[in-house]
Amino acid sequence: MAVDSKIVVSCTSRLFTDEVCKLQEKVGCIVPLRDSHGSQNLQTVGLKPALGIDLGSDYVLMCNYLSTCTLAILEEVTTDSLVLTKISRNGTYQIKNKYHPFFQWDSNIQVCVMPPLFDQESNSVDLQSNNFTLLLPIVVPCEVAHEALQKVLTYNIYLRVTQAEPNAARMADVLAQTNYVTYLGNHYSLNLEGMESLGALAFLDNLATYLCIMVGLLPRACVRLLTTLLRHGENELLNVFRRMIPDEFNAAAANLNADTVYPDMTKIGLLITYLQTLGSIFNLSPRLQVSTYTPENLSATCWYVC
C-alpha cells in the first residue's frame, strides 16, 4: 500500500467487540470521506457529513456529495481505528460486492457508487461506543443506478405537481410505477415514500432553471440552420423536428447580419456551459470499471472512471 494512499481514521473511543465484527464485514467496501488527508476522525467518514447532524433520507443530497467527496476502500479495522486506501484515477483496486440488497456484478462492466436507496439500515453500522452511525453508499451496475435516478426524479416531479394541484394525478398510481427497480428479473423496492424531498426539490429547481436558460440561449442562427438544411432526400426526422419550433422562434431568426454574430457566439458558449452542467447532473458519477469479477469470493478488480 502506497504511503500517500493510506488513510487512518481514529475513533474517539475504543470500539466494542461487536462493532469491530460488523465493520470487518464491510472490509473491501467503498467508503466516502469528506477530506483527502491521511489522518482523519469518524466525523468525516461515510455519508453523514452530507446530511449534517440528522441522518435523514435526502438521497439527492447524498448523490451530490458522492460526486465531490474522496472515495476510499476499507482495508482494516482495529479497536481504535479504521485503515483505508484512497482511490485515485491512476490506480487499480480490489473491492468487494458486500452491499444490500445484493446486485450481481460481472467482468467488464461499469458500476456506480450511489446512496443506499434500497436499504439504508443494512448499509449502516451503529457505533454506540463513539455515538456515531456510519452510513455507507452502495455500488451497483450502472443500469441499476440509471433506472433508480429516473424513477426518483419522476416520483418527485409528480409529487411536486400534486402538492400544488392535488387532482393532477393519483400518487398511489405514481408510486406503484416508480417505487422499484428491476434487474435480472428481480424487483427491488426504492422506499420513495420515506424519502426527504428537500434535496430533490432543489435538484428540480436547478434542472428547470438550466432547461429554461438553454431555451432562451438557443442562437437564432441555429434556428435558421433547420430551414436552410431543407433539401431533397433529407432525413425524415429533420422535417419532424422542424415543425416543433414555435413560430416566434422562426420570426426572431429571420434577420441575420453582422450584428447577430457576436450575440450568437456568446449564446453558443453559454449553451455549451449549461449542457455540461446538465451532463454533470446525470452522469451517475462516481463510476468504476470492473475488469475481472470472481463470484465465489465477491471480489472485483477495478479502476476509477470518473
Swiss-Prot record:
Domain of life: Viruses
Gene Ontology MF, one: structural molecule activity
Localization in the cell: Virion; Host nucleus
Keyword Membrane: no
Keywords (A to Z) from UniProt: Capsid protein, Host nucleus, Virion
Record InterPro entries: Herpes_capsid_2
One cellular-component annotation, GO: host cell nucleus
UniProt subunit comment: Interacts with TRX1 and major capisd protein/MCP.
Stated family: Belongs to the herpesviridae TRX2 protein family.
Function, in words: Structural component of the T=16 icosahedral capsid. The capsid is composed of pentamers and hexamers of major capsid protein/MCP, which are linked together by heterotrimers called triplexes. These triplexes are formed by a single molecule of triplex protein 1/TRX1 and two copies of triplex protein 2/TRX2. Additionally, TRX1 is required for efficient transport of TRX2 to the nucleus, which is the site of capsid assembly.
Protein name: Triplex capsid protein 2
